[in-house]
């Protein structure tokens, strides 16, 4: 009984899977893809530029660069003092 019920379900599932894509779902041809490429690249470049500018402005406004510079200065000073004490 289960086999009789599962066979029609299997056939319907296979027919849906093996069905050709509808014309609206078909992949666009290569020439139409190339026509829209410059616009998409320009939009991508503008978006990337805006995001980069925002990130740079956020870094400039934060105190992270000053903290990093101070940390490197202090650490370098400690290392320099350690070398002077060790090798003098």
Curated annotation (Swiss-Prot):
Family annotation (InterPro entries): ApoC-1_sf, ApoC-I
GO molecular function, one term: phospholipase inhibitor activity
Keyword Lipoprotein included in the entry's annotation: no
Keyword Signal: yes
Signal peptide range: 1-26
Protein keywords: Lipid transport, Secreted, Signal, Transport, VLDL
GO biological process: lipid transport; lipoprotein metabolic process; negative regulation of cholesterol transport; negative regulation of lipid catabolic process; negative regulation of very-low-density lipoprotein particle clearance; triglyceride metabolic process; very-low-density lipoprotein particle clearance
Superkingdom assignment: Eukaryota
GO cellular component: high-density lipoprotein particle; very-low-density lipoprotein particle
Subcellular location, record wording: Secreted
UniProt record similarity statement: Belongs to the apolipoprotein C1 family.
Cited function: Inhibitor of lipoprotein binding to the low density lipoprotein (LDL) receptor, LDL receptor-related protein, and very low density lipoprotein (VLDL) receptor. Associates with high density lipoproteins (HDL) and the triacylglycerol-rich lipoproteins in the plasma and makes up about 10% of the protein of the VLDL and 2% of that of HDL. Appears to interfere directly with fatty acid uptake and is also the major plasma inhibitor of cholesteryl ester transfer protein (CETP). Binds free fatty acids and reduces their intracellular esterification.
Name of this chain's protein: Apolipoprotein C-I
Name of the gene this protein is made from: APOC1
């Amino acid at each position: 009984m289960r086999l009789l019920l599962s066979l029609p379900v299997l056939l319907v599932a296979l027919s849906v899977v093996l069905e050709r894509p509808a014309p609206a779902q078909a992949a666009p041809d290569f020439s139409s893809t190339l026509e829209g490429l410059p616009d998409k690249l320009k939009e991508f470049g503008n978006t990337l530029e805006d995001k980069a500018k925002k990130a740079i402005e956020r870094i400039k406004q934060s105190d992270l660069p000053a903290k990093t510079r101070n940390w490197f200065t202090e650490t370098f000073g400690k290392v320099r003092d350690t070398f002077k004490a060790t090798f003098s």
